Amino acid sequence: MIVKIITMEAQQRIFFDFLKFCIEAVAEIPVSVKYADWKVQYAIAKKQALIGVLLHGIKQLPKELAPDADLLMTWMGLAQKIHQQNIRLFMDSVKVCHNFKQEGYRCCILKGQGNALLYPDPYMRTPGDIDIYLAGGRKRIMQYINKVCPNQVMRYHHVDFPMMKTAIEVHFTPSYMFYPKHNHRMQKWLGEVMGLQCSNVVALPDGYGEISVPTVNFNVIYILSHLYRHVFTEGIGLRQ
């Protein structure tokens, strides 16, 4: 039992060593990779929704360090599905942004396909739903939501907007804090900076269109606050 625990701990350390290489935080292939149990590495990557991220690094390994052919084919098959999912999410994000702008709302895609652009390969991130911030205030936004999709349950910072196969969450505010005083400060700051985020238009890869996404400076605070909140509620994985 002790040997298994040590082995798993060692594999976890190898995983994090290799992950740094996969996201190009380090340039050299980690020495520890030669001790990788690729079935264990695959299981960790799948659990953390990082299949595509690790494959990006695996493609750069010499043959003697790479997974066996059968596992590699399975890995590549899943990564190809992730690639296709990203294409759909890029296209859907463009549609959603366009539709809301047509309705007179300034908007900004939070996390999601905006975060995908921060990866070495924008198709390597496992996508989820579409989180979109709308300017205009909770009351005005809910009037529109209730007109288009009646009977949606409003939460403090967002409401579901089931208008396509891809799940959409419409945000009145990007984030919040639990402690009222801290949340007041955060909402004040968000009120000052969200105009800039809605104006930050970027081009998606391969001509899929344009969307508004947060600036890197904004994401430094926003993503960390999102992680902080999830640690105390739903839990959080490594994929962002």
Go through the PLM ranges and name each one.
Residues I2-G128, Y133-Q240:
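Conserved NTP-donor binding/palm subdomain of two-metal-ion nucleotidyltransferases/polymerases, i.e.
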